[in-house]
From Swiss-Prot:
One GO BP: gluconeogenesis
This protein's name: Fructose-1,6-bisphosphatase class 1
The entry's keywords: Carbohydrate metabolism, Cytoplasm, Hydrolase, Magnesium, Metal-binding
Source organism phylogeny: Bacteria, Pseudomonadati, Pseudomonadota, Betaproteobacteria, Neisseriales
Similarity-based family: Belongs to the FBPase class 1 family.
Any one GO cellular component localisation term in the record: cytosol
Quaternary structure note: Homotetramer.
Primary location recorded for the protein, binned into one broad class: cytoplasm
Enzyme class at the top of the EC tree: hydrolase
Entry note: cofactor: Binds 2 magnesium ions per subunit.
Positions bound to Mg(2+) 2: 107, 110, 271
Length: 324
C-alpha cells in the first residue's frame, strides 16, 4: 500500500500540480500528526479541560484548542510557501512567508466540546492561492470554488487523513510507525440515504421548511417519504462528514430564528467550504438551502453559514422545500 510520501509526488505530477502545494499539505499533515499525539494522551498529558480564554466567536476555548492552534501556526509558518494563515481561534489572519504563494485556513480542533469525553474530533483545512499584492483580510475572501485543496484529519479509533486537490478524494490511515497509508481512493457518496444528522433540541428555533422536512423523515414509511430513517448526532462536524463520506447520509446545521445576524453556526471559510469541496468531489451536494456552499461570496473571515450536506437526493429535496 502507498504511503502518503510515495503517493503525493505521483499524484501531483499526474494532475500537473505544483510541488510546493504538496509541500503545504505535508506541513498540515505534520502538524496534525503532532496534534494526534496530544489528543491520544489526553489526561495523561494534562491537556484536557478549559483554557480559561475565549476566541473571536465568543466560545470558551479548551486547552487542546489552544495547543492545536499553536501547533498548526508554528508548523505552517515554517514553510516558506505559506504566505498567511487564518484560524477559528485567531481574531485576524496571521502573516507568514513574505514570498509565499499559498494561504491556509483551518479549524485546529473541530468538535472540541467532545474532547473531555473521548469522542472523535478533528482538524479541518483549506488551501487557497494568495492573490497578487500585500496580504490582507481580503486576500482570504475567496469562494469555495477557488480552493486548491481541502481536507481534514479525524482523530478517532483510527487517525485518518482525507483530502482532495480537486481530482477525487483520497483517504489515508495513520499506522503504528506514524506514517499515513492509502486505504481508500475516490469514495462516492450514495445519492439516496436513510440517515440524517441534526441537533433535534433546536427544533423549536428552525425555519418552517426544516421543521417540515424533519417531520417527514420521522414519519417513516407511513409518511410522505415512504421509508424509515435513522438519526445520528455526534456534535463533531468531522465525524459527521466522515460517516457520510463512508456510507451516505445528510448533515444539517440550518439557519434558525434566534439571531438574524447569524445565518448559521458553522464557519464558511474553514469548515463549510473545505467539507463542501470534499463532498462534491465524492458526488454529494452541499448548500445553505438557497445556493451551493462553494458559490457563496464571503464577506468576512469568520462568516457563519447554514449547512446542508450529503446525499444529493436529500439536499436537493430540502432545497426545494426552502424555495416554495
Amino acid at each position: 500500500m502507498d504511503t502518503l510520501t510515495r503517493f503525493l509526488p505521483e499524484h501531483l505530477q499526474q494532475n500537473q500540480l505544483p510541488e510546493a502545494l504538496g509541500g503545504v499539505l505535508l506541513s498540515v499533515v505534520s502538524a496534525c500528526t503532532e496534534i494526534n499525539a496530544k489528543v491520544r494522551l489526553g489526561a495523561l498529558a494534562g491537556v484536557l479541560g478549559m483554557a480559561g480564554t475565549g476566541n473571536i466567536q465568543g466560545e470558551d476555548q479548551k486547552k487542546l484548542d489552544v495547543i492545536a492552534n499553536n501547533i498548526m501556526i508554528d508548523t505552517l509558518k515554517a514553510n516558506p510557501a505559506v504566505a498567511g494563515l487564518a484560524s477559528e481561534e485567531e481574531d485576524s489572519f496571521v502573516s507568514a512567508g513574505e514570498n509565499g504563494r499559498y494561504l491556509v485556513l483551518f479549524d485546529p480542533l473541530d468538535g472540541s466540546s467532545n474532547i473531555d469525553v473521548n469522542i472523535s474530533v478533528g482538524t479541518i483545512f483549506s488551501i487557497l492561492e494568495k492573490p497578487e499584492g500585500a496580504l490582507a483580510t481580503e486576500s482570504f475572501l475567496q469562494t469555495g470554488r477557488q480552493q486548491l485543496a481541502a481536507g481534514y484529519v479525524l482523530y478517532g479509533p483510527q487517525t485518518q487523513l482525507v483530502f482532495t486537490f480537486g481530482h477525487g478524494v483520497y483517504m489515508f490511515t495513520l499506522n503504528a510507525e506514524n506514517e499515513f497509508v492509502l486505504t481508500k481512493e475516490k469514495p462516492k457518496v450514495p445519492e439516496s440515504t436513510k440517515e440524517f444528522a441534526i441537533n433535534m433540541s433546536n427544533r423549536r428555533h428552525w425555519l418552517p421548511p426544516v421543521q417540515q422536512y424533519i417531520d417527514e423523515l420521522l414519519a417513516g414509511e407511513t409518511g410522505t417519504r415512504g421509508k424509515n430513517y435513522n438519526m445520528r448526532w455526534v456534535a463533531s462536524m468531522v465525524a459527521e462528514i466522515h460517516r457520510i463520506l463512508m456510507r451516505g447520509g445528510v448533515f444539517m446545521y440550518p439557519q434558525d430564528k434566534r439571531d438574524p445576524s447569524k445565518p448559521g453556526k458553522l464557519r464558511l471559510m474553514y469548515e463549510a467550504n473545505p467539507m463542501a469541496l470534499i463532498l462534491e468531489q465524492a458526488g454529494a451536494s452541499a448548500s445553505n438551502a438557497r445556493q451551493d456552499i462553494l458559490g457563496i461570496r464571503p464577506e468576512s473571515l469568520h462568516q457563519r453559514v447554514a449547512v446542508i450536506m450529503g446525499s444529493s437526493e436529500e439536499v436537493d429535496y430540502l432545497n426545494r422545500l426552502h424555495s416554495k
